[in-house]
From Swiss-Prot:
Gene3D superfamilies: Aspartate/ornithine carbamoyltransferase. PANTHER family: ORNITHINE CARBAMOYLTRANSFERASE, MITOCHONDRIAL (PTHR45753), ORNITHINE TRANSCARBAMYLASE, MITOCHONDRIAL (PTHR45753:SF3). This is Ornithine carbamoyltransferase. Reversibly catalyzes the transfer of the carbamoyl group from carbamoyl phosphate (CP) to the N(epsilon) atom of ornithine (ORN) to produce L-citrulline. Belongs to the aspartate/ornithine carbamoyltransferase superfamily. OTCase family. GO terms for molecular function: amino acid binding; ornithine carbamoyltransferase activity. GO terms for biological process: arginine biosynthetic process via ornithine; citrulline biosynthetic process; L-arginine biosynthetic process. The lineage of its organism: Archaea, Methanobacteriati, Methanobacteriota, Archaeoglobi, Archaeoglobales. The gene is argF. Its EC number is 2.1.3.3.
Length: 307
């Protein structure tokens, strides 16, 4: 694995190595172990879109690992004034040891990676969000102990996180039921690829049907960054897909609820569910830190130093 742009960049063994490594790093942090696995290493973080969790978790990850992270806003770089992506990629490759990017278009990060001589990490694009989903898998594993008997119901928009989770289902053997309104389905090319990889996917329009056998219910915002003009239409289309106490009545008693945050409480998820006994949302958010530490070590060839 040279870069992490998509969940499809991972082999099954690589994914499980990252999850195992993340568990170990989490344990070390809770014990207060001081590490310097990435001493004298620098990560450039390029943000075309704003972030709370991605920025903080990557910065803290590099600090915890003994390295350094540089925040680079899109408009602070010459990229914002028209410098070609390939030039920026070549230059930054001479300065830093890895680059994380949070961008509008997936094609941007693909082009950057083509010209970069250091690992490039997708911190979010319009197509995928692999860092989020690796953290999600760590969380599911902590709660369920395995993936083979887990059914995850995706309720809401077939967005970038959904796309990455579909590929993750293929890699882990987890079953996935996807419930979206018409015209808001996940990317068909990703669905096809996942099915070719052996993914066990089922598509249903009725969210009540989708959650019946679910061990995990996952939702995300109905209106993502850049879709503000569609907000009214989306609110109308997605209203039946709200994750509420009423919807949970149709699921298992021990179901857990996930959301990658930020949440629009009262839209895709109610306040009661966010704060309720089924929610593992904040454990999930914490795991961004541990998962991304593992991703960084794996890409920089330092994972063997942990054991």
């Amino acid at each position: 694995m040279k870069h992490l742009l998509s969940m499809a960049d991972l082999e099954k063994d690589e994914l499980f190595e990252i999850l195992k490594l993340a568990e170990k790093l989490k344990e070390e942090r809770y014990k207060g172990v001081v590490t310097d696995y990435l001493k004298n290493k620098s990560l450039a973080m390029i943000f075309e879109l704003p972030s709370t969790r991605t920025r903080v978790s990557f910065e803290v990850a590099m600090t915890d690992l003994g390295g350094h992270a540089l925040y680079l806003g899109w408009d602070e770089l010459q990229l914002g004034r028209g410098e070609p992506i390939k030039d920026t990629a070549r230059v930054l490759s001479r300065y830093v040891h890895a680059v994380m990017m949070r961008v509008r278009e997936h094609s941007t990060i693909e082009e950057f990676a083509r010209y970069s001589t250091v690992p490039v990490i997708n911190g979010l694009s319009n197509l995928e969000h692999p860092c989020q989903v690796i953290a999600d898998l760590l969380t599911i594993y902590e709660y369920r102990g395995d993936f083979k008997d887990v059914t995850l119901a995706w309720v809401g928009d077939g967005n970038n996180v959904c796309n990455s989770m579909i590929l993750a289902a293929a890699l882990t053997g987890m079953k996935m039921v996807i419930s979206t309104p018409e015209n808001y389905d996940p990317n068909p090319e990703i669905v096809k690829k996942a099915e070719e990889m052996g993914a066990k996917l089922r598509f249903v329009r009725d969210p009540k049907e989708a959650v019946k056998e679910a061990d995990v219910i996952y939702t995300d915002v109905w209106t993502s960054m850049g879709q503000e003009a569609e907000k009214e239409a989306r609110l109308k289309a997605f209203q039946p897909y709200q994750v509420s106490d009423e919807l949970l009545k149709f699921s298992k008693d021990d179901v857990v609820v996930m959301h990658c945050l930020p949440a629009h409480r009262g839209e895709e998820i109610t306040d009661e569910v966010m704060e309720g006994k089924h929610s593992i949302v904040f454990d999930q958010a914490e795991n961004r830190l541990h998962a991304q530490k593992a991703i960084l070590l794996k890409l920089l060839g330092k994972e063997s130093e942990v054991y």
